[in-house]
C-alpha cells in the first residue's frame, strides 16, 4: 500500500513540474500549443501536411497571432492563455505515423 502512495505522490509531483514548465516556457501566453512550437524537420512537415484542414487552419491562426503579438511586444489576456489541462497534442498521432512509415521504408531499403 505504501508503494502505491509513493508512486501517486511522485506522479503528482512530476505533473506539478510539467504544469510549471508549461507556464514558464511562455508560449501559452501567446495562445500557442506545445505542438505549434515543435521544430519543423522533414517528419514534422509531413505530419503537418497530413493534418485535417480545420486543425491546420487553427494552427496557422495561432502561429500568426503569436507572431503579431510578439512583434507588438504584447501577450494575450490571462483568460485567453492556453492551459496545460486543455492541451491536446493534435500533431502527435500524425507524427508517430510518419515516423513509423519512415522507419519502415528504411528497413525495406536495407533489404
Curated annotation (Swiss-Prot):
Topology versus the membrane: Peripheral membrane protein
Protein location:
Mitochondrion inner membrane
Modified positions (N6-acetyllysine) in chain numbering: 12, 19, 78, 83, 96
Spell out the InterPro entries in the cross-references: QCR7, QCR7_sf
Q: Which UniProt keywords apply?
A: Acetylation, Electron transport, Membrane, Mitochondrion, Mitochondrion inner membrane, Primary mitochondrial disease, Respiratory chain, Transport
Would the keyword Electron transport turn up in this protein's UniProt record? yes
Q: Can you cite an annotated GO cellular component?
A: respiratory chain complex III
- Which residues are modified to N6-succinyllysine? 12, 78
SUPFAM superfamilies given in the database record: 14 kDa protein of cytochrome bc1 complex (Ubiquinol-cytochrome c reductase)
Q: Which residues form a coiled coil?
A: none
The signal peptide stretch is none
> Highest taxon of the source?
Eukaryota
Single Gene Ontology BP annotation:
mitochondrial electron transport, ubiquinol to cytochrome c
Record PTM N-acetylalanine, positions in chain: 2
Role noted for this protein: Component of the ubiquinol-cytochrome c oxidoreductase, a multisubunit transmembrane complex that is part of the mitochondrial electron transport chain which drives oxidative phosphorylation.
- Name the disease: Mitochondrial complex III deficiency, nuclear type 3: A disorder of the mitochondrial respiratory chain resulting in a highly variable phenotype depending on which tissues are affected. Clinical features include mitochondrial encephalopathy, psychomotor retardation, ataxia, severe failure to thrive, liver dysfunction, renal tubulopathy, muscle weakness and exercise intolerance.
Q: How does it assemble?
A: Component of the ubiquinol-cytochrome c oxidoreductase (cytochrome b-c1 complex, complex III, CIII), a multisubunit enzyme composed of 11 subunits. The complex is composed of 3 respiratory subunits cytochrome b, cytochrome c1 and Rieske protein UQCRFS1, 2 core protein subunits UQCRC1/QCR1 and UQCRC2/QCR2, and 6 low-molecular weight protein subunits UQCRH/QCR6, UQCRB/QCR7, UQCRQ/QCR8, UQCR10/QCR9, UQCR11/QCR10 and subunit 9, the cleavage product of Rieske protein UQCRFS1.
Query: What family is it from?
Result: Belongs to the UQCRB/QCR7 family.
Protein known as? Cytochrome b-c1 complex subunit 7
Q: Which species?
A: Homo sapiens
Amino acid at each position: 500500500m505504501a508503494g502505491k502512495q509513493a508512486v501517486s505522490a511522485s506522479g503528482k509531483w512530476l505533473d506539478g513540474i510539467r504544469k510549471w514548465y508549461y507556464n514558464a516556457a511562455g508560449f501559452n501566453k501567446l495562445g500557442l500549443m506545445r505542438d505549434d512550437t515543435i521544430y519543423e524537420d522533414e517528419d514534422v512537415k509531413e505530419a503537418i501536411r497530413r493534418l485535417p484542414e480545420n486543425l491546420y487552419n487553427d494552427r496557422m491562426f495561432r502561429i500568426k497571432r503569436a507572431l503579431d503579438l510578439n512583434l507588438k511586444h504584447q501577450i494575450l489576456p490571462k483568460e485567453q492563455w492556453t492551459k496545460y489541462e486543455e492541451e491536446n497534442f493534435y500533431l502527435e498521432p500524425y507524427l508517430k505515423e510518419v515516423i513509423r512509415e519512415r522507419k519502415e521504408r528504411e528497413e525495406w531499403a536495407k533489404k
